[in-house]
Amino acid sequence: MAAGCCGVKKQKLSSSPPSGSGGGGDASSSSHCSGESQCRAGELGLGGAGTRLNGLGGLTGGGSGSGCTLSPPQGCGGGGGGIALSPPPSCGVGTLLSTPAAATSSSPSSSSAASSSSPGSRKMVVSAEMCCFCFDVLYCHLYGYQQPRTPRFTNEPYPLFVTWKIGRDKRLRGCIGTFSAMNLHSGLREYTLTSALKDSRFPPMTRDELPRLFCSVSLLTNFEDVCDYLDWEVGVHGIRIEFINEKGSKRTATYLPEVAKEQGWDHIQTIDSLLRKGGYKAPITNEFRKTIKLTRYRSEKMTLSYAEYLAHRQHHHFQNGIGHPLPPYNHYS
């Protein structure tokens, strides 16, 4: 079931802040990953299980998009519905919700992030190969090539987001994901194209934009229901809220862990932005905030620029037998 991180119809979730404001936009189906645009929740027409979310503040407009038929996932040069929120536990205690292969720490968002976390914690799952795979899937789609081979990285199920940014200022270009755990090979393949082509805040991506793109993959872990809506840490936790709007309808919305820190928001500003993103239009009072059901989570995140993708592809091109030519508009020495 699709869901935008701001959650509306079929509870789509969106996790990025609305564009042009420090507050929220309307909430709906897809999920964005950056703070620039609004995330409206709507239903996305791309097939596949999972709750679709916008991961960076705002709502991505509703309405089903034209479906994309994707062939089975295949790798790029290496490496391998609605959202049900449980009621908060008794105050003062967070309940850890089971997530597949949950990791203990979130990863840095830069492309140079190490693939292991702090000493003593488990090795991170997210990797540059996952971003490379997303680039390869998008490239093959835009140029009409057969989809690449199955990647070599793990195919364990995770809730995930794929985020695209563009240009030197890294403006948000698309961000959609799901809170439903999906096998990574099919999930990344699906949400690569959904976020690039079906984010209703933006027109579909074109070939000309490829050289300026940055791709981020976020794997969501460590979901915990908490009693206090302030019981989460800015820059560490992503948050997903469930609330009843002024019309008596249940709504959901989410921000990925990096959003509040990037926007310079404190807890209250983040919650209020998320309520607006989720479509709450009445005045926000402290009493209303206390009625929110909040789930906090962490993420592992990896970002890769197009230039880094090309370097990776060039290195692995022959040994991995990629069945389509390298991008024609960048020169190799």
From Swiss-Prot:
The keyword Nucleus applies. This is Nuclear protein AMMECR1. PROSITE patterns: AMMECR1. GO terms for cellular component: nucleus. Residues 119-313 form the AMMECR1 domain. It comes from Pongo abelii. The modification Phosphoserine is found at residue 16. Residues 27-37, 101-119 have a biased composition (Low complexity). It is found in: Nucleus. The lineage of its organism: Eukaryota, Metazoa, Chordata, Craniata, Vertebrata. Keywords: Nucleus, Phosphoprotein. InterPro entries: AMMECR1, AMMECR1_dom_sf, AMMECR1_domain, AMMECR1_N. It holds the Pfam family AMMECR1. Residues 1-39, 101-120 are annotated as: Disordered. It comes from the Eukaryota.
